[in-house]
Amino acid sequence: MKVLLISQGSTGDIYPLIALGKALQKANHSVAYATAPLYKEEIEKAGIKYQYAPPDWEKPVFVDCMRALDRQPNPIALLKQIYRSGLSFMGELIDTIDGLIQENDLVVCSYIFPHFKVLCDRHKVPFATITFCHSVIPAKDVTPDLIPKLNGFPASIQYLWNSFWWRLINKVVDQSINSISGPTFKSRQIPPIKNFISAPADLSIVCVSKSLMQQSRFLDSRFTYTGYLRWQSDTNDALEKELIQFCEDDAVPIITFGSVSFDNIQDIMSRFEKNWPKGQKIILQSGWAGLSIQINRPEIKIIDQVSHDQLFKYAACVIHHGGAGTTASVLHAGIPHV
């Protein structure tokens, strides 16, 4: 079977589908991955066929987009900003994916792009989505995030309450996306988004561990939990020697914010330098935010990109942004994290 994988975003959006692609290859399927050229090298190093998809951005543009996302006050505003960021290339992206779909037997796509299902239906190609966040999976015995829980109320009342909020959130999300991308969808004969939350596809893969969450008795059968899909970049041998020399057989704290970026970095790092105890070793991964310090402190080790598995074996604990990929790696390593 020929499978097309589609995703966009930061490394946390890209790497899980590389892991999925390798699993599909192991099961003797042919796999191609359509995403931005920024990730072409990593995809091809994994032995997966790369397919071009816009945007053809350099890394600094992606960093600016991540910084804009960090400014959003709530999940709905964040989702709207994601679609707003993609307006300049959304039409080209739809056209590109439309051309690739007909060459494949199955499409597995990031949950951000459920509108590609319309294209798959036109070509009679099965379509599935993949999501990295369990908090957007609706069930009447699970209260949506940020909504008060009715603990202590009869189960029937709780179910009505939760179902109401899931339906409302579903409509708000649909309207929010359509308000941004509706004209582009219309120009490609794609109807407005409907049921982004409740019915994104006939199959929605949730790559989160079931053991970490409440087990819903009313989960729609379209949502299937696979556990985390982890992919690690190659080991950096030169950095390995530096880490061994720096740590001297001791585990040390590690700070990493991955591909998240944010405002006022210089002020934040100045406070960090002022308050971090002298002589206490720590590893600081610069990440997409470009974290750094302004003075020479030999007890603070600044490093660039490296795989979680290589880095976290030196960790006493990890302070991180809570991204799905980083959280999965910390849990895999079995170390404390904040």
Where in this protein do the model-derived segments appear?
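A donor-sugar binding/catalytic signature common to diverse glycosyltransferases
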Residues: 21, 107-109, 303-338
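Phosphate/nucleotide-donor binding subsite
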Residues: 49-104, 155-163, 171
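Long, low-complexity segments enriched in small/aliphatic residues
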Residues: 177-228
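Donor-nucleotide binding loops and adjacent catalytic segments primarily
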Residues: 207-317
